[in-house]
Amino acid sequence: MSESLQDIALRMVTTGKGILAADESTASIKKRLESIGVESTPESRRDYREMLFRADAMRQSISGVILYDETLRQSAADGTPLRQLIVDAGSLIGIKVDTGTSPLPNFPGETITEGLDGLGKRIAEYHELGARFAKWRGVIAISNGLPTWGAVRSNAHALARYAALCQAGGIVPIVEP
């Protein structure tokens, strides 16, 4: 690997810059676009993302951009891969790798994050496509009697496996509990 995990992590936390979360799912971006009267199509989603990634502020303010799988594979109207726009702006490419949550069996009201199956292969593909960091979201319910130790332990185990797979694949893991 040409760049160490430490080098990537240091670039992510560059003073005065932040990480842009542009990893909204197709359903989430549909709501965002429809709220301003724009139909959600592959083209309108591409145009919205292209506008973000071509903004002058990208170079000055953004150290990395978390993408959704669709975005990582999309190209701008002129054919330039959107991921290249991010790199050209001096930012790192990140990717959301969890696939959402599902109810945690035997733990009413609690969830487990899905996406570990096949993650090693996906990490290798994402690295090949230019991703250098990833995000995994663990959702822990906090209320009267929650979280239970079993749910915390199950989610911590999933987060640890995700982080280990990322590191083995040359990608810095962001752990978002």
Labelled PLM ranges:
Residues V97, G138, P177:
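Short glycine-centered, acidic/aromatic-flanked micro-motifs in structured strand/loop junctions
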Residues V65, A134, P173-I174:
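Hydrophobic residues within beta-strands of alpha/beta enzymes
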Residues L119-F133, N155-I171:
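Structured alpha-helical segments in the cores of large, soluble enzyme domains
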Residues T41, W136, V175:
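Conserved, mostly hydrophobic/aromatic
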Residues S143, P173-P177:
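Conserved strand-turn element in the central/C-terminal portion of the radical SAM core barrel
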Residues M1-L129, I142:
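Alpha/beta catalytic barrel-like cores
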Residues I36, A134-W136:
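Broad hydrophobic/π-residue packing in well-ordered secondary structure
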Residues G109-E110, I140-V152:
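Surface-exposed cleft-lining segments at the edges of enzyme active sites
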